[in-house]
Amino acid sequence: MPELPEVEVTRRGIEPYVAGRRVERVDVRTPALRWPIPPGFARLLHGRLVRKVERRGKYLLFEIDEGWFIVHLGMTGTLRVLRNVPHPPAAAKHDHVDWIFDDFILRFRDPRRFGAVLWHPRSAGDVLDHPLLADLGVEPFAPSFSGALLHRKTRGRKVSVKQALLAGEIVVGVGNIYASESLFRAGIRPTTPAGRISLVRYDLLADAVRVTLAAAIEKGGSTLRDFVGSNGESGYFQLDYFVYDRAGQPCRVCGTPIKQIVQGQRSTYYCPTCQR
């Protein structure tokens, strides 16, 4: 599943193309995604100017005068910029939505159809008040994200620290891959109850989350199965993993074999020596 780095890589790749440009047409081939694309969506966007593209958690927010259309990549979704000159590229089976501009197409592809294309009218208030966005945690690169925040929000909680990161109620966008990698950098075992971790160790974890996500964005995200950036290129951060998907391989720091366990039906990877 695309996590925060992959969504941010997509946003950075798309915005220079679409910001300040008008949508000439929208082709909706598959309205039945995770949630149905609203009727009249294509007509609503016809001729509209895209002001900017922002990100909240794993959601992409495209602003036009009348509101915002929201895109979530789901498990296998991608957004690609494709040149339509001299001929528009043919759509394949899993290409569900095209936003057509004068000299390129923004194409949403999603083989498993767990992604979403939604509409939030300006009359309904700010886009951050949308039901899917209103209760999200703090952004990991925001000044308000800190070890003190993690420490305060987890007091009395028995859930594991990894599950607390994944929940998205405290901090957004830290999915399975980057939770495992961040906990390794901080030297914290993922099974540790969140409420038992000290402020000092949470300071280390907050720094580790930021460093890990920034490094992943710099490498274009991770490509394990489906993800490609807006230009169709794969990410390369998976080559730098310390623990994720490395079960049985030696730790890059101490040489101890990486251990794999299951938490909440998801695989967790850690070093039994480096992480306490």
From Swiss-Prot:
SMART domains: Fapy_DNA_glyco, H2TH. CDD domains: EcFpg-like_N. Its cofactor is Zn(2+). DNA binds at H94, R112, R157. It catalyses: Hydrolysis of DNA containing ring-opened 7-methylguanine residues, releasing 2,6-diamino-4-hydroxy-5-(N-methyl)formamidopyrimidine; 2'-deoxyribonucleotide-(2'-deoxyribose 5'-phosphate)-2'-deoxyribonucleotide-DNA = a 3'-end 2'-deoxyribonucleotide-(2,3-dehydro-2,3-deoxyribose 5'-phosphate)-DNA + a 5'-end 5'-phospho-2'-deoxyribonucleoside-DNA + H(+). GO terms for biological process: base-excision repair. PANTHER family: FORMAMIDOPYRIMIDINE-DNA GLYCOSYLASE. HAMAP family: Fapy_DNA_glycosyl (MF_00103). This is Formamidopyrimidine-DNA glycosylase. The lineage of its organism: Bacteria, Pseudomonadati, Pseudomonadota, Betaproteobacteria, Burkholderiales.
